[in-house]
Regions:
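Short alpha-helical catalytic segment bearing the HExxH-like zincin motif
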Residues: 108-112, 229, 279, 283, ...
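Intramembrane catalytic core of multi-pass membrane enzymes that act on lipidic substrates
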Residues: 55-176
C-alpha cells in the first residue's frame, strides 16, 4: 500500500505528459508552457517552500516508486520521438522552440532520474539510466558521476564542483571538458584493471550509439531532425551542469595530514527542502544525504541540517546565471556556515 506522503511523487509524470500535449501544438505553445512551468515552480519554491517531513530513518523504500521512474524512461523516449516528428517539417524557429521545451524535460527530469536509476543495484535500472543519458548525447556521465564525482565531490579535483568566486560561465567549459576527459580515463583504467578490451565498454558502445543516432536522424529527417536532437540534448546538459554548479558551490572538503580527503559530510553540499520541486525531482535537493548514502532510494533521503540554498533549484538556476547576484546571495551563506553552523549541524547529523 503506497504511503500517503509518497503520492506526491506521481507529479513525476506531469511534465513529460504535458510536454507531449504541447509539442503537438507547435513550438510557440511548447515554449510558453516551458516558461510557465518554470515560473510556477520557482515561484512556489520562493513564496511557499512547504518543507517536507523526513521519512523515519528505518522506513523501507517504496518499490512502486522505482516503477514510476521506469515508466518515465519510456515517456522520455516517446517525448523525444514526438518532438522529432514535429520538428522534421517545422520552421527553424519552431525547431529551436520545440528543442528547448523537450530539453527542459529531458534535463530537469530525465537526467535526474537517470542519476537515480544509475545508483540502483538493478541491471534493468542501470540499463535505463544508460538509455536516458544516451538520449541526451551525454553517456559519459554514467562513468564520471559514479566513479569520479562521488569520490571527489567538494574538492578541486572534481570538475563538477564549483569553487568559491567561480562564475557559472567559467565553470561550464571547465566541467564539460574535465568530465568528458576524466570519464574516458576512468573507463580505460577500469578495463585495464579487469583485463578487458574496449569491446566490453558500455561507454564506447553508448558513444557509438550517439554517432549512429545522429546519422540515422540526418538520413530520416534531414538537418532539422538532427539539429532538434542535438539542441534538446544541449539544453538538457546545460541544466545538468548548472545544477552541478549549484550543488557544491564554494564548499570544500579538508585535506587530512596523511594527504587523504576528509569523508564527505553534511556540510559539503547545498540543500533545499521544498516540497514541490523535490516531488518533481525525486528529492535531489536533499543532496547531503544523497552523497553520504549514495545507494539510498530517493524516497528515504533525510532533510539534514546542512547548508541551505536561498530557494529551490528552479530559482537558483536563474540566480546562478547572473554572477554578481549569485555571489551576493551565496557568499554570506558560505561565511555563515563556516562561522558556526557547520559544527552544530554535523554533530546533529551524526546523532
Amino acid at each position: 500500500m503506497p504511503r500517503t506522503r509518497d503520492l506526491r511523487f506521481l507529479l513525476i509524470g506531469f511534465l513529460p505528459l504535458l510536454a507531449l500535449l504541447n509539442v503537438s501544438f507547435g513550438g510557440v505553445a511548447a515554449a510558453l508552457w516551458t516558461v510557465g512551468i518554470w515560473a510556477v515552480v520557482a515561484g512556489v519554491d520562493a513564496f511557499w517552500p512547504g518543507a517536507q517531513r523526513s521519512p523515519p530513518p528505518a522506513d523501507a523504500p517504496q518499490g512502486w516508486l522505482v516503477g514510476v521512474l521506469r515508466v518515465y524512461a519510456v515517456l522520455q523516449i516517446v517525448l523525444i520521438a514526438a518532438g522529432l516528428l514535429a520538428a522534421r517539417d517545422a520552421r527553424w524557429l519552431d525547431v529551436a522552440l520545440l528543442a528547448g521545451a523537450v530539453g527542459f524535460v529531458t534535463g530537469a527530469q530525465g537526467i535526474t532520474f537517470a542519476h537515480e536509476l544509475g545508483h540502483s543495484r538493478s541491471r534493468l535500472d542501470r540499463a535505463l539510466a544508460w538509455l536516458l543519458m544516451t538520449s541526451v548525447a551525454y553517456p559519459h556521465f554514467m562513468v564520471e558521476h559514479y566513479r569520479g564525482h562521488h569520490p571527489r565531490a567538494a574538492t578541486h579535483d572534481d570538475p563538477a564542483s564549483a569553487r568559491r568566486g567561480e562564475s557559472l560561465w567559467r565553470f561550464l567549459p571547465r566541467t564539460l571538458a574535465g568530465s568528458l576527459r576524466h570519464a574516458w580515463q576512468l573507463e580505460a583504467a577500469q578495463l585495464r584493471q579487469l583485463q578487458r578490451g574496449w569491446a566490453t565498454s558500455p561507454l564506447l558502445w553508448s558513444s557509438l550509439a550517439v554517432v549512429g543516432v545522429s546519422a540515422a536522424l540526418l538520413a530520416w529527417g534531414g538537418a532539422r531532425a538532427l539539429v532538434f536532437w542535438w539542441l534538446q540534448s544541449a539544453v538538457a546538459v546545460l541544466l545538468l551542469e548548472t545544477v552541478n554548479y549549484i550543488e557544491h558551490y564554494g564548499l570544500q572538503r579538508a585535506t587530512l595530514p596523511g594527504g587523504q580527503r576528509e569523508p564527505f559530510a553534511v556540510g559539503h553540499a547545498w540543500n533545499a527542502d521544498h516540497v514541490v520541486s523535490n516531488s518533481l525531482l525525486a528529492n535531489l535537493q536533499r543532496h547531503s544525504d544523497h552523497h553520504m548514502h549514495a545507494w539510498k532510494p530517493f524516497d528515504t533521503l533525510q532533510a539534514l541540517p546542512g547548508p541551505q540554498l536561498p530557494t529551490g533549484y528552479a530559482g537558483c538556476l536563474l540566480l546562478a546565471a547572473v554572477p554578481p547576484l549569485w555571489f551576493g546571495l551565496m557568499h554570506p551563506r558560505l561565511e555563515e556556515w563556516s562561522a558556526g553552523e557547520r559544527g552544530e549541524a554535523e554533530v546533529l547529523s551524526n546523532l
